[in-house]
Amino acid sequence: MYMGVIGKSPEIEILRELRGARILITGLSAVAGVDIARAFADIHARLIIHTTDMQPEVTELFALLSQNAAEMKLYTNPIARPEDSIRLAQNAQQAYGGLDAVINLQSISSAEMQSIATQEQVETLIAAKLSPLTHITHVAANRMRVVLSEGSVLNILTAPKPQNAREAAIAGIARTALAAMTRGEAGQWADQAVRINGVGPRSMSAQPAGATLTNEPDIAALALYLASKRGKTLSGHVFDADGLFAGGA
């Protein structure tokens, strides 16, 4: 939804506005978040990058990002436990004296899809995926409230394109959980000028409300738009993604 309005190429005023913006990106890996990080680095934002993926291609990416970003800080500790995700959000807030936008990345892998055999396993997996996003969203939004700062949080949960009805059902449950979290958080922070949105697996049971995000440059353009003043009227929405980050863990 709304991608027809947002477009795929950020307008020049958005790029100027976000120059020097303080951006936290969590969950970056070789298969998720590369184009998003590049998009913000290219407009000379100040980046805080979280990753646990230290493959050679990822370390090469960091070198490239550091050349273009106004500043960059890197965190590599796992954030699966609540205390770890909270600590990351707090450290990120302190890095540049606050945050203007947060992009949290999570993906359900093909292997995880295939390993699920029960409803309980589905619920456990989705809870594990959404928990860090929820804690980081709370800390970031609360800090924005305290300092009377407008801000944006975009929580991205993607899954590979379903190969059968069972996988489609899992993706649908994941989207429903993300949508509930997004609406709840958006409602909680609505009067504080903090915007909460999501990107989730496209529902196979309904026609999408707008264009579907089919590649990461689409998501990068969306993240730029939502972080800018142009996106200040959008909160509580979950945008459709189709089969992204299929190799993610």
Spell out what each predicted region is.
Residues 26, 99-110, 129, 155, ...:
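Rossmann-fold scaffold of SDR-type NAD(P)-dependent oxidoreductases
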Residues 108-109, 115, 124, 145-191, ...:
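Catalytic loop of short-chain dehydrogenase/reductase
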Residues 44-60:
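Conserved glycine-rich Rossmann-like NAD(P)H-binding loop of the short-chain dehydrogenase/reductase
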Residues 90, 127-148, 186-187, 191, ...:
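Amphipathic alpha-helical dimer-interface segment in Rossmann-like NAD(P)H-dependent oxidoreductases
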Residues 2-7, 191, 198-199, 209-247:
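C-terminal helical subdomain
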Residues 21, 71, 97-101, 144-159, ...:
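Active-site loop of short-chain dehydrogenase/reductase
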Residues 9-48:
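Canonical Rossmann dinucleotide-binding motif of NAD(H)/NADP(H)-dependent dehydrogenases/reductases
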Residues 78-90, 94, 107-124, 167-170:
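Conserved mid-core segment of classical short-chain dehydrogenase/reductases
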